[in-house]
Amino acid sequence: MIHKLLIAYDGSDSAKAAFDLALDLAGKYGAELHVLAVARPPEFGAEVETEAVIESSRRHYTHLLQPLKTRAAGLTAHFEVMVGHPAEGIVLYAEDHGIDHIVVGHRGHGLFERWLLGSVARQVIAYTRCTVTVVRG
C-alpha cells in the first residue's frame, strides 16, 4: 500500500513519464502526492553570481511545476523546489516527509557515462529506505 508518493521532476521526457505513473498510482491508492524539483547550484562563480543563478533556477522550476498542479487537481498534492544535489535532495526529502514510494525518471545515458557519473536514479535507489520505481524515458 502506498500512502505518500514522491515524484522527482526535472522536466525531462523520463520525468514526464514518471509523473504520469505517479498520478496513476496516487489516484489508485489514494496516496498523498509530493512533487519535488531539485535545482543544482552552480559549482563556481562569485557569491552574487551564484545567488542570481540559484534564484533563476528556482523561478525556472517553479514555472516548470505549474502545469503539473492542474493535472494533480483532486489529489492531495504538495509541490516544492529546492536547491542542492538532486539525489541527496530526493533522499532527504523522502526521509523528512515519511515518503514510502519514490518515482524517478532515468535518462538513457551510455554505459561509460553511467559508470563515470552514476545516475540520480541509481543513487536514490542506493541511499533511500523506501521503494523506488524507475521510469525510462
Task: Give residue spans per PLM region.
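A short acidic, glycine-rich active-site loop
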Residues: 51-63
